[in-house]
Amino acid sequence: MAIGLPRCMANPSPPLLIKKNNHTLMEITLEQLLKSRDQRWDTERRLLQEFPGQTLVVLTVVMPGRVKRNAHTRVIARAAEAAVQAFLGPKVVLRYTNDAPTGYEAYWIVRAEARSVKRQMCGIEDFHPLGRLFDLDVIQSDATPLSRTDVGFAPRRCLLCDQEARWCMRNHTHTQEEILQRIDEMVREFNAEN
């Protein structure tokens, strides 16, 4: 057993595989999720060091629960990438993607002012049909992330009601099933129109 770690973290249980609609879905563990966040932070730091003075955009897909990769997340990730690429276009210095079991990630190093980029990304989150399912972080060259409120946008709203999303998450206002059902509806509507 690793020193200083609780037994459950030193010997994590293997991921649970689930069959649904003839697809095998992998549930991730809390340890995997936490490790992926650390790895994402390391990737962000490394990219900013390799490209000093540039802005970093990081995409992750909003997907509650222990299954982070499925048919819906692939549709959401492709739509987000296309929207971001369309906005950033020739300003992109580097694009890097990571389709990990813990969720899809994409990174763009951009030659543009961070606040302007953050406003564009907030516009995508607010106005793209699937934008509520995109998490588009903009990180300044000094590794400081910009929030929506930093650039004059309101905090993100809940998928199901008009409350601030953070408030509903913190208070467990909606069940995971309700949220996943709304995501399913959004992706089906998007697919029907595209």
Label every model-predicted segment:
Residues I18-Q85, D99, R119-N194:
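Long, contiguous binding/interaction regions
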Residues R111-V117:
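Helix N-cap motif at beta-to-alpha junctions
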Residues A71, W108-R111:
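Short glycine/threonine-rich loop-to-helix capping motif typified by GTGT followed
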